[in-house]
């Protein structure tokens, strides 16, 4: 397979995942902005700041920077080194771990997806300004996650070496 096709597949994997994060952050940012524009009490401002700091640490640093982003970058490198049609066409899904992954990773990805859907359904029922306060923290986490993903992808691509295991089973044909 041509080198440029493999490189494009790896780029599609990382950029596709980053695009989903950016899209979600922009969608949620409108709710956070609505809450701030409507005016917050001092207690609500305090909770907004505490939530943003907590989500930066929990979602951004621990979730994305230490786990998700390096793994997505490692799997994008795997797309480049071991391309298949499925991996190239569906590179963002492969890089996120939805297929061609260890049983543990697939289980964690699907459980994580279900929990995100549940959180979205629950957050939709929360009135303003509380929804905006919650969404502001998620936006901070997603922003951190996007930046950490781009940094991890660049470092992995530059070194041509994954920073963490790609968590691909030994006999993965997809």
What are the language-model segments listed below?
Residues 25-35, 60-65, 121-131:
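Juxtamembrane "helix-exit" motif on the non-cytosolic side of transmembrane helices
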Residues 103-141:
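Hydrophobic alpha-helical transmembrane segments and immediately flanking/interface helices
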Residues 1-7, 35-42, 129:
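Juxtamembrane loop-transmembrane helix junctions in multi-pass integral membrane proteins
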Residues 60-102:
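Membrane-proximal soluble regions of multi-pass membrane proteins
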Residues 13-25, 49-57, 94, 106-122:
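Hydrophobic alpha-helical transmembrane segments of multi-pass integral membrane proteins
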Residues 36-74, 148:
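Hydrophobic alpha-helical membrane-embedded segments
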Residues 1-31, 142-173:
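Cytosolic-side membrane-entry/anchor segment at the start of a transmembrane helix
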Residues 72-83, 101-118, 165-174:
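Alpha-helical membrane-embedding segments
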């Amino acid at each position: 397979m041509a080198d440029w096709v493999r490189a494009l597949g790896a780029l599609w994997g990382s950029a596709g995942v980053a695009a989903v994060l950016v899209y979600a952050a922009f969608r949620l940012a409108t709710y956070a902005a609505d809450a701030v524009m409507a005016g917050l009490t001092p207690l609500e401002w305090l909770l907004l700041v505490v939530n943003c700091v907590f989500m930066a640490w929990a979602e951004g640093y621990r979730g994305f920077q230490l786990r998700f982003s390096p793994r997505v970058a490692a799997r994008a490198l795997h797309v480049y080194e071991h391309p298949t049609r499925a991996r190239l066409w569906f590179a963002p899904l492969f890089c996120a771990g939805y297929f061609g992954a260890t049983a543990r990773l697939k289980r964690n990805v699907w459980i994580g997806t279900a929990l995100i859907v549940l959180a979205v359904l629950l957050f939709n029922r929360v009135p303003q300004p509380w929804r905006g306060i919650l969404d502001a923290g998620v936006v901070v986490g997603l922003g951190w996650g996007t930046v950490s993903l781009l940094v991890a992808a660049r470092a992995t691509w530059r070194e041509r070496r994954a920073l963490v295991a790609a968590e691909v089973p030994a006999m993965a044909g997809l």
